Amino acid sequence: MTYKIIGDSCLDLTEELKKDPGFQMIPLTLQVGNVQVIDDETFDQSAFIEMVKACPECPKTACPSPESFKKAYEEADADAVFVITLSNHLSGSYNSAVLAKELYEEEKKEAGEPVTKKIAVIDSLSASSGELDQALYIRDLCEQGLNFETVAEMAEAYSHRMKTYFVLETLDTLRKNGRLSGLQAFFATALNIKPVMGAEEGVIIKLDQARGINKALQRMCDIAVKETGDTPGTVSYTHLRAHETGAYL
Protein backbone atom coordinates (compact mmCIF):
# COMPACT_ATOMS: atom_id res chain seq x y z
CA MET A 1 0.00 0.00 0.00
CA THR A 2 1.39 3.38 -1.00
CA TYR A 3 0.44 6.17 1.38
CA LYS A 4 0.52 9.92 1.98
CA ILE A 5 0.21 11.72 5.31
CA ILE A 6 -1.43 15.15 5.20
CA GLY A 7 -1.83 17.55 8.11
CA ASP A 8 -2.81 21.13 8.82
CA SER A 9 0.18 23.39 9.42
CA CYS A 10 0.11 22.77 13.16
CA LEU A 11 1.66 19.39 12.30
CA ASP A 12 5.14 20.11 13.67
CA LEU A 13 7.25 18.46 10.98
CA THR A 14 11.03 18.55 11.30
CA GLU A 15 13.00 20.21 8.50
CA GLU A 16 13.94 16.75 7.23
CA LEU A 17 10.32 15.55 7.12
CA LYS A 18 9.25 18.72 5.28
CA LYS A 19 11.37 17.47 2.37
CA ASP A 20 9.81 14.00 2.47
CA PRO A 21 7.22 13.62 -0.34
CA GLY A 22 5.24 11.29 1.92
CA PHE A 23 4.19 14.26 4.08
CA GLN A 24 2.26 17.40 3.23
CA MET A 25 0.96 20.35 5.25
CA ILE A 26 -2.08 22.49 4.41
CA PRO A 27 -1.63 26.00 5.87
CA LEU A 28 -3.81 27.62 8.49
CA THR A 29 -4.48 31.35 8.24
CA LEU A 30 -3.56 33.44 11.29
CA GLN A 31 -5.29 36.74 12.05
CA VAL A 32 -3.56 39.35 14.22
CA GLY A 33 -5.60 42.53 14.39
CA ASN A 34 -6.26 43.45 10.76
CA VAL A 35 -3.30 41.47 9.43
CA GLN A 36 -3.64 38.00 7.91
CA VAL A 37 -0.63 35.67 7.96
CA ILE A 38 -0.47 32.40 6.02
CA ASP A 39 1.24 29.62 7.96
CA ASP A 40 3.26 28.25 5.06
CA GLU A 41 6.93 28.24 4.03
CA THR A 42 6.92 32.07 4.03
CA PHE A 43 5.90 32.24 7.70
CA ASP A 44 8.25 34.42 9.80
CA GLN A 45 7.91 33.16 13.36
CA SER A 46 9.89 35.97 15.01
CA ALA A 47 7.93 38.70 13.23
CA PHE A 48 4.65 36.97 14.06
CA ILE A 49 5.49 36.73 17.78
CA GLU A 50 6.33 40.44 17.93
CA MET A 51 3.09 41.22 16.09
CA VAL A 52 1.09 39.20 18.64
CA LYS A 53 2.81 40.94 21.56
CA ALA A 54 2.00 44.36 20.14
CA CYS A 55 -1.65 43.61 19.34
CA PRO A 56 -4.20 44.22 22.14
CA GLU A 57 -6.52 41.59 20.67
CA CYS A 58 -6.15 37.83 20.89
CA PRO A 59 -4.86 36.28 17.64
CA LYS A 60 -7.29 34.06 15.74
CA THR A 61 -6.87 31.18 13.33
CA ALA A 62 -8.85 30.09 10.29
CA CYS A 63 -8.69 26.44 9.31
CA PRO A 64 -7.77 25.31 5.79
CA SER A 65 -10.77 25.27 3.45
CA PRO A 66 -12.38 22.00 2.33
CA GLU A 67 -11.27 22.89 -1.20
CA SER A 68 -7.60 23.01 -0.17
CA PHE A 69 -7.87 19.61 1.52
CA LYS A 70 -9.75 18.15 -1.46
CA LYS A 71 -7.09 19.40 -3.86
CA ALA A 72 -4.44 17.66 -1.75
CA TYR A 73 -6.45 14.42 -1.83
CA GLU A 74 -6.79 14.61 -5.61
CA GLU A 75 -3.09 15.26 -6.13
CA ALA A 76 -1.86 12.62 -3.68
CA ASP A 77 -0.08 9.90 -5.64
CA ALA A 78 -0.99 7.13 -3.20
CA ASP A 79 -3.46 4.34 -2.55
CA ALA A 80 -4.18 5.64 0.95
CA VAL A 81 -4.31 9.14 2.43
CA PHE A 82 -4.16 9.69 6.18
CA VAL A 83 -5.12 13.17 7.37
CA ILE A 84 -4.14 14.43 10.83
CA THR A 85 -5.68 17.58 12.26
CA LEU A 86 -5.62 19.81 15.30
CA SER A 87 -8.06 18.89 18.05
CA ASN A 88 -11.59 19.64 16.86
CA HIS A 89 -12.02 21.65 20.09
CA LEU A 90 -9.29 24.06 18.95
CA SER A 91 -9.90 24.36 15.21
CA GLY A 92 -12.30 23.55 12.41
CA SER A 93 -9.56 21.67 10.52
CA TYR A 94 -11.05 18.26 11.32
CA ASN A 95 -14.52 19.16 10.05
CA SER A 96 -13.02 20.80 6.96
CA ALA A 97 -10.95 17.71 6.15
CA VAL A 98 -13.96 15.41 6.65
CA LEU A 99 -16.12 17.57 4.37
CA ALA A 100 -13.36 17.52 1.76
CA LYS A 101 -13.32 13.71 1.89
CA GLU A 102 -17.09 13.59 1.37
CA LEU A 103 -16.89 16.04 -1.55
CA TYR A 104 -14.05 14.09 -3.16
CA GLU A 105 -15.94 10.80 -2.96
CA GLU A 106 -19.24 12.33 -4.13
CA GLU A 107 -17.60 13.90 -7.18
CA LYS A 108 -16.03 10.58 -8.11
CA LYS A 109 -19.37 8.80 -7.85
CA GLU A 110 -21.23 11.50 -9.80
CA ALA A 111 -18.64 11.17 -12.57
CA GLY A 112 -19.17 7.42 -12.62
CA GLU A 113 -15.60 6.80 -11.51
CA PRO A 114 -14.61 4.25 -8.86
CA VAL A 115 -13.34 5.64 -5.55
CA THR A 116 -10.06 3.77 -5.42
CA LYS A 117 -8.18 6.14 -3.12
CA LYS A 118 -8.93 5.50 0.54
CA ILE A 119 -8.94 8.49 2.91
CA ALA A 120 -8.95 8.48 6.72
CA VAL A 121 -9.31 11.74 8.67
CA ILE A 122 -7.97 11.49 12.22
CA ASP A 123 -8.53 14.03 14.99
CA SER A 124 -5.22 14.16 16.89
CA LEU A 125 -7.04 15.52 19.98
CA SER A 126 -3.77 17.42 20.39
CA ALA A 127 -1.56 19.85 18.48
CA SER A 128 2.02 20.47 17.37
CA SER A 129 4.28 17.61 18.48
CA GLY A 130 1.14 15.61 19.32
CA GLU A 131 0.21 15.72 15.64
CA LEU A 132 3.78 14.80 14.73
CA ASP A 133 3.70 11.77 17.04
CA GLN A 134 0.52 10.65 15.32
CA ALA A 135 2.07 11.13 11.87
CA LEU A 136 5.17 9.11 12.74
CA TYR A 137 3.01 6.39 14.28
CA ILE A 138 0.97 6.13 11.08
CA ARG A 139 4.13 6.03 8.97
CA ASP A 140 5.52 3.18 11.07
CA LEU A 141 2.28 1.20 10.75
CA CYS A 142 2.23 1.68 6.98
CA GLU A 143 5.87 0.62 6.70
CA GLN A 144 4.98 -2.57 8.57
CA GLY A 145 2.69 -3.45 5.67
CA LEU A 146 -0.60 -3.22 7.58
CA ASN A 147 -3.75 -2.62 5.54
CA PHE A 148 -5.60 0.69 5.39
CA GLU A 149 -8.43 -0.25 7.75
CA THR A 150 -6.04 -1.52 10.43
CA VAL A 151 -3.84 1.58 10.25
CA ALA A 152 -6.85 3.90 10.45
CA GLU A 153 -8.30 2.03 13.44
CA MET A 154 -4.98 1.95 15.32
CA ALA A 155 -4.33 5.64 14.59
CA GLU A 156 -7.75 6.57 15.97
CA ALA A 157 -7.04 4.61 19.15
CA TYR A 158 -3.62 6.26 19.43
CA SER A 159 -5.23 9.71 19.57
CA HIS A 160 -7.26 8.71 22.62
CA ARG A 161 -4.25 7.08 24.26
CA MET A 162 -1.79 9.93 23.74
CA LYS A 163 -1.21 12.46 26.54
CA THR A 164 -0.55 16.17 26.00
CA TYR A 165 0.96 18.55 28.56
CA PHE A 166 2.29 22.10 28.32
CA VAL A 167 3.37 25.10 30.39
CA LEU A 168 2.54 28.71 29.57
CA GLU A 169 5.35 31.14 30.25
CA THR A 170 3.16 34.19 29.64
CA LEU A 171 -0.51 34.78 30.44
CA ASP A 172 -1.02 37.45 27.77
CA THR A 173 -3.10 35.26 25.46
CA LEU A 174 -5.34 34.06 28.31
CA ARG A 175 -5.88 37.70 29.29
CA LYS A 176 -6.59 38.82 25.73
CA ASN A 177 -9.14 36.08 25.07
CA GLY A 178 -10.95 36.73 28.35
CA ARG A 179 -10.06 33.49 30.14
CA LEU A 180 -8.24 35.57 32.77
CA SER A 181 -9.23 39.03 33.96
CA GLY A 182 -6.63 41.76 33.77
CA LEU A 183 -6.40 41.72 37.57
CA GLN A 184 -5.89 37.95 37.72
CA ALA A 185 -3.21 38.14 35.04
CA PHE A 186 -1.50 41.01 36.87
CA PHE A 187 -1.25 39.15 40.19
CA ALA A 188 -0.25 35.86 38.53
CA THR A 189 2.51 37.66 36.63
CA ALA A 190 3.64 39.56 39.73
CA LEU A 191 3.86 36.28 41.67
CA ASN A 192 5.58 34.55 38.74
CA ILE A 193 2.86 31.88 38.59
CA LYS A 194 3.00 29.57 35.57
CA PRO A 195 0.00 27.34 34.78
CA VAL A 196 0.55 23.67 33.96
CA MET A 197 -1.94 22.68 31.27
CA GLY A 198 -3.06 19.51 29.57
CA ALA A 199 -5.63 18.14 27.15
CA GLU A 200 -8.46 15.78 27.99
CA GLU A 201 -10.03 14.29 24.84
CA GLY A 202 -8.80 17.36 22.98
CA VAL A 203 -10.14 19.92 25.46
CA ILE A 204 -7.55 22.17 27.14
CA ILE A 205 -7.66 21.98 30.94
CA LYS A 206 -5.57 23.42 33.77
CA LEU A 207 -3.81 20.70 35.76
CA ASP A 208 -1.80 22.70 38.29
CA GLN A 209 0.39 25.75 38.71
CA ALA A 210 3.78 26.62 40.15
CA ARG A 211 5.93 29.66 40.86
CA GLY A 212 8.65 29.99 38.26
CA ILE A 213 9.09 28.27 34.93
CA ASN A 214 11.46 25.54 36.16
CA LYS A 215 9.12 24.48 38.97
CA ALA A 216 6.22 24.46 36.53
CA LEU A 217 8.18 22.29 34.10
CA GLN A 218 9.12 19.92 36.91
CA ARG A 219 5.49 19.72 37.97
CA MET A 220 4.47 18.99 34.38
CA CYS A 221 7.00 16.15 34.22
CA ASP A 222 5.80 14.78 37.57
CA ILE A 223 2.21 14.73 36.32
CA ALA A 224 3.24 13.05 33.06
CA VAL A 225 5.19 10.33 34.87
CA LYS A 226 2.35 9.72 37.32
CA GLU A 227 -0.31 9.47 34.61
CA THR A 228 1.65 7.34 32.15
CA GLY A 229 3.51 5.12 34.62
CA ASP A 230 5.60 2.42 32.95
CA THR A 231 3.62 2.52 29.70
CA PRO A 232 6.11 2.26 26.80
CA GLY A 233 5.90 4.96 24.17
CA THR A 234 7.44 8.03 22.59
CA VAL A 235 8.03 11.34 24.37
CA SER A 236 8.16 14.43 22.17
CA TYR A 237 8.46 18.06 23.20
CA THR A 238 8.19 21.37 21.40
CA HIS A 239 9.23 24.81 22.54
CA LEU A 240 8.83 28.29 21.12
CA ARG A 241 12.16 30.10 21.15
CA ALA A 242 12.89 28.61 24.58
CA HIS A 243 16.09 26.65 24.06
CA GLU A 244 17.04 26.72 27.75
CA THR A 245 13.65 25.25 28.60
CA GLY A 246 14.17 22.53 26.02
CA ALA A 247 17.54 21.71 27.50
CA TYR A 248 16.01 21.60 31.00
CA LEU A 249 13.40 19.09 29.86
Specify the residue positions occupied by each region the protein language model found:
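N-terminal glycine-rich anion-binding loop in soluble enzyme alpha/beta folds
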Residues: K4-S68
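Short catalytic-loop micro-motif centered on adjacent basic/acidic residues
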Residues: K60, V83, V121, S236-Y237
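Short beta-strand segments
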Residues: G7, T85-S87, D123
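Short, charge-rich binding segments
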Residues: K71-A78, E106-P114
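Mixed-charge interfacial surface used for oligomerization/domain docking
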Residues: K4, C10-Q24, T29, A97-E102, ...
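Short, charged beta->alpha transition segments
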Residues: S65-E75, L103, M220
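Structural motif
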Residues: K4, A80-F82
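Short Gly/Thr/Asp-enriched flexible loops that form oxyanion-binding sites at enzyme active sites
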Residues: L86-K109, D133-A135
